[in-house]
UniProtKB/Swiss-Prot annotation:
It comes from the Bacteria. This is Large ribosomal subunit protein uL14. InterPro entries: Ribosomal_uL14, Ribosomal_uL14_bac-type, Ribosomal_uL14_CS, Ribosomal_uL14_sf. The keyword Zinc-finger does not apply. It holds the Pfam family Ribosomal_L14. It comes from Buchnera aphidicola subsp. Acyrthosiphon kondoi (Acyrthosiphon kondoi symbiotic bacterium).
């Protein structure tokens, strides 16, 4: 469950290390975002010479949450931290060319096939 002011790790090679959620997109007064939801983020920590820089405001898709995601069979997949993949503001395609760490199968339903294909492991 990601809400405003939540700090997330970045699971791609866009150059950002830590980001903060500033808005959960999808409906007015929506409070929480889960895996597969798009959020508006600002870069809080970035590496030198990356594709993004500190202070940039972009969109991102949540790929891992500590809260986890419940499957129809009753199982829950949880992670050690919250992570997102930074998206281009216009095309909503990933900015980075590599994804680090596992992602969940729920992204397939949310039309993020590019992230699924780049990920090293899909749970």
């Amino acid at each position: 469950m990601i809400q405003e002011q939540t700090m997330l790790n970045v699971a791609d090679n866009s150059g950002a290390r830590r980001v903060m959620c500033i808005k959960v997109l999808g409906g007015s007064h929506r409070r929480y975002a889960g895996v597969g939801d798009i959020i508006k983020i600002t870069i809080k920590e970035a590496i030198p010479r990356g594709k993004v820089k500190k202070g940039d405001v972009l969109k991102a898709v949540v790929v891992r949450t500590k809260k986890g995601v419940r499957r129809p069979d009753g199982s829950v997949i949880r992670f050690d931290g919250n992570a997102c993949v930074i998206l281009n503001n216009n095309s909503e395609q990933p900015v980075g060319t590599r994804i680090f760490g596992p992602v969940t199968r729920e992204l397939r339903n949310e039309r993020f096939m590019k992230i699924i294909s780049l990920a090293p492991e899909v749970l």
